Amino acid sequence: MAPDDFIEMIGNAAGKICADYNLPASVCIAQAALESGWGEYVIGNYNYFGRKWNRLGEYLELPTKEYIDGQFVTIQDKFQSYSSLDEAIEDWCVLMTEEPAYADALAEWESTWDVEAFIRAMAPVYATDPDYADKIISTINANNLMRFDGWND
């Protein structure tokens, strides 16, 4: 899917749902774009985020690349499956706001309202790729994704 088409598909839903959780939709959209290759590689149903199985609901077990001990390796892992795009976005929001592993990132966000600081605190928890934060930031900037952040209306 072309980036503009992907952004059109997810942008407004992410903007609305992320605003309900007081989170930056730009980060949500950029992560979905990166994890799914702009919608080309969706895992199961609506898993645009590459979200690992949370032990609730249905999952698919698939090979995935992870960065371990300084190199990318392929492992088998379980990935979440969703019934709708909105459910996937909401699950991302719940992950960011309720999962203890993201507490520092959430605290950084709530104290600074700095999207880049939030990304840099969140990225090492979310992904093993050491360049993940830079990739998210680049995707946001290249596609003007901050226009979907609720406080930029």
Locate predicted features.
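Catalytic cores of secreted/periplasmic lytic hydrolases that degrade extracellular macromolecules
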Residues: 1-153
